[in-house]
Amino acid sequence: MLRITGGTVYDPANKIDGQIKDLNIDAEGKFCDAPVDGRTIDATGMIVMPGGVDVHTHVAGGAINFARAMTPEDHRRTQAFIRTKTRRSGIGGMAPTTFATGYLYAGMGWTTVNEAAVPVLSARHTHEELADIPIVDKSTLTLMANNEIMLDQMEAGEYERARDVVAWYIWAAKSYGVKAVNPGGVAAWKWGGDARQLSSPIEGYDKITPGTIVTQLARICDDLGLPHPMHLHCNDLGAPGNITTTLDTLKHLEGSRAHIAHSQYHAYGGDDWDTICSATAQLAEYFNTHPNITTDAGAVIFGDTVTITADGPWQHLLYKLTGRKWGNLDVENETGCGIVPYTYRPSNLVNAVQWACGLELLLLIQNPWQVFLSTDHPNGGCF
């Protein structure tokens, strides 16, 4: 039981805007009107608000472990968490270990994190690792947009069977919803290709296109009544001029719910690295007129980090652009994974545009319930 007294409370969901009031929490963790026995915290002069939710992060599973193994130099230079009577040991840095992840998130006021990319093949281990992260609540999303079994059903025109495949995978992986990464592009990467636009059949198939996958997978999530809509990492991430692909993707989502992940990486104009520019105004305008679509910003932080994504072809391109270390994983017939360390520099035109795009989206989208603050940890920087 807990009582918090004298704090300035902000709670938008309950329309509390800066009121000084006492809060009473009973033994079940619920608010109650009557004062309770137990611990009292004097929050005079402090702000009391609901815990933050990081809707898109990468904190557990094979990919983040691969990233940790690839960056031993970061372990040597980073903050160490020494074991005490109340705390387990760990390290921070670009990809903090499990215990450190929980402590660092809680220290910033976050109480829920969503591991946004889990292959079914490694879901069991991911849950074991999530159980090791203290304090915060956790959820996961299952990678589906390049799953060969589902794609085969879509190719055959068997929508109901494709829906049942997705339902079984979500049940088997014990996840909160569906993650779609570069739909069709990761499947094409297994053949050395990619899918940077939505209208051409993907490698290995005659009929289905990335647009088909986007439309049908969003519909499947709606038909299954999932609490979170399809969580979409669009095609052509990170490329100059990719705003065209992003807006085309959104047209394929008309009438469906969807969440666009790390939208900063999908909001670029220009036609080359020398002419890359922000196109966030176009994207924000779409969000402002389509309340069925939510997004997280994917803002970047200047400094060293390590990028991890199921978008294998993009990571191979990033490796060629930077000359840094590169790791690539093929997850059987489900998905893929790429790892590349990266440094965001304010003196770099592309990085400066990326930094500005993340802030612009947070400011230009009018409904604050429609946009989430995220760094796509660790891709845009450690949370």
Residue spans of the language-model regions?
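Terminal or standalone catalytic/regulatory effector modules within metabolic enzymes
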Residues: 372-383
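Metal-associated gating/positioning segment near the N- to mid-region
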Residues: 43-129
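N-terminal metal-binding scaffold of metallo-dependent hydrolase/deaminase domains
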Residues: 1-49
